[in-house]
């Protein structure tokens, strides 16, 4: 969870009902079958809020280009093993449920280095550039974009990923692709 969002700075601390967004995300993760839950952040404000609701937090550098790069720093601090499965839930996804997280855990397939979830694309999200779209062929992601033309294989991407620590060690050494930079979507680095 980072403080300096280009679209809405401080987004993880925005209140949804009685709680900050980051607390909703953390609580969904804690309810899942994941063994451990940590918030990785570059912000002392976010850290303080997480500690206030008794969450576990790992401080990271402000220099990371993406959340996945931030996760890499965090897992090096907790001594992740290559075979450990990491579930990366974006800090601004308060409506991802523990059932979504469990679905990703239960269905992770080692034949693929990275996995994610998607759902039907609602009509109101078609032209919304904040709603990331995923193009799927045979249950395999072929591309991601904020601005796809509608077709039968376009869905709404959920901000959650699964990968082994071994893959993450490789991912952070890949150069950012042109598509990743243009779209501001880190998952394109894995596809490209």
Where in the sequence are the language-model features?
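Short, high-confidence coil segments that cap the C-terminus of an alpha-helix
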Residues: 34, 82-83, 110-114
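Short aromatic/basic micro-patch
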Residues: 7, 15, 95, 162, ...
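A C-terminal functional module that forms or caps the active site or interfaces directly
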Residues: 172-192
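Short phosphate-binding loop-to-helix
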Residues: 38, 44-89, 93-106
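Conserved core of the sugar-phosphate nucleotidyltransferase
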Residues: 96-179
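N-terminal glycine-rich phosphate-binding loop and ensuing alpha1 helix
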Residues: 1-41
């Amino acid at each position: 969870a980072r403080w300096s969002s280009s679209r809405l700075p401080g987004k993880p601390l925005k209140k949804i009902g009685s709680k900050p967004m980051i607390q909703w995300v953390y609580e969904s993760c804690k309810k899942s079958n994941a063994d451990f839950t940590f918030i990785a952040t570059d912000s002392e404000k976010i850290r303080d809020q997480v500690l206030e609701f008794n969450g576990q937090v790992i401080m990271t550098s402000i220099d990371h280009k993406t959340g996945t790069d931030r996760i890499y720093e965090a897992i090096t601090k907790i001594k992740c093993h290559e075979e450990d499965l990491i579930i990366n839930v974006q800090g601004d996804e308060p409506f991802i449920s523990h059932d979504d997280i469990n679905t990703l855990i239960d269905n992770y397939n080692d034949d693929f280095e990275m996995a994610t979830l998607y759902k039907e694309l609602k009509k109101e999200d078609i032209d919304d550039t904040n709603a990331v779209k995923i193009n799927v062929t045979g249950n395999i992601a072929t591309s991601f974009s904020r601005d796809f033309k509608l077709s039968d294989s376009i869905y709404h991407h959920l901000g959650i990923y699964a990968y082994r620590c071994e893959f993450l060690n490789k991912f952070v050494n890949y150069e950012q692709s042109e598509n990743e930079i243009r779209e501001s979507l880190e998952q394109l680095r894995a596809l490209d």
